[in-house]
Amino acid sequence: ISLLLTASLAAALLTGCGGKASEGGAAAKKTMVIGDTTFNSENWEETVDPHRTYNGWACIRYGIGETLVRYTDSMELEPWLAKSWSNDGDRTWTIVLQDDVTFSSGRKMDAAAVKQCLEHLLENHDRAPSDTKIVDVAADGQVLTVTTSEPNPALMNYLGDPYGCIIDVDASDFENGIVAGTGPYVVKELVTDDHLTLTPNTQYWNGTPKLDELTIRTLSNGDTLSAALQAGDIDAAYGMAYE
C-alpha cells in the first residue's frame, strides 16, 4: 500500500494537481507545500539518499529518483528506467535500460552509471545485499548483466523497492545526502527535520514537471499536520494518522 501511495503522490507532482499559482497572470509561479510527518531523522528519513536506511521513500515519493521497475495498481511490475528484463532461469539477469535518460546532474543514465549505483547500494545499505543476492554487475552500453549468488526470482521486485532509486553517485552533493536522480524534481535545499525544497528537473525524460517549486515541511505529529492543512498553511498532507 505504501508503494502505491508513493507512486500516486509522485504522479500528482508531475501533473501539478493541488498546487497553487501566485499572482501574475500567465506567468504565475505554480507552487505546492506538503506537510509530512514521516520525513524526519526519527523515522530514518533524514535525507533523500536511498542508500541510507529508509531515505529512499522520500527520494521516490517527491519525484527525485526513479527505480528500474515500478508497481502498477494491481501490484504487477512494469518498466520504468528499465525497458525490459529477462532471466536465464538460473542466476543471470539481463536488464535493458531506457535510452535518452539523463540524471539531474547532466550525466547520461547508461549501464555503467547504473552499475556504479547498484554497487554503492550493495556496499552501504543494510537490506539490499540479502534481498537481491547480487554478486556481480556488468555493463555494456544500455545493457546490464546481473548475477546473483543463487536463483532469486524476486530480484526485480526488490529493485523496485525505494532503495533501488537509480542515482548518480558521482554527483557533487551526494555525500551530503542530496542526490541527483532521474525524476522530475531536483533538490534546491535540504534542512533535516525542517524542510526540503525542490525545483523542476529541466532535463526530465518522461514529461514536463508542472510545479515551479515544491516544499516539504516536516511536521511533528498528526495533530499538527491536520491543523496546518485546515488553516491553509499547507496544500497537502502525507503521514496523517488513520482514524
Question: At which residue positions do the language-model features occur?
Answer:
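Aromatic- and charge-enriched surface segment that lines or borders ligand/interaction sites
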Residues: 83-125, 228
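Ligand-site clamp/hinge motif
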Residues: 203-243
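Short, well-ordered beta-strand elements
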Residues: 28-39, 92-96, 114-117, 144-146, ...
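Gly/Pro-rich hinge or "lid" segments in bacterial periplasmic/extracellular proteins
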Residues: 54, 159-209, 213, 223
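Surface-exposed binding/hinge segments that line
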Residues: 86, 129-169
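Short, low-complexity disordered leader/linker segments with a strong preference
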Residues: 1-32, 39, 44-46, 76, ...
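Short, solvent-exposed loop/turn elements at domain surfaces
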Residues: 28, 40-51, 75-78, 154-157, ...
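N-terminal lobe/hinge region of extracytoplasmic solute-binding protein
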Residues: 35-88, 180-181
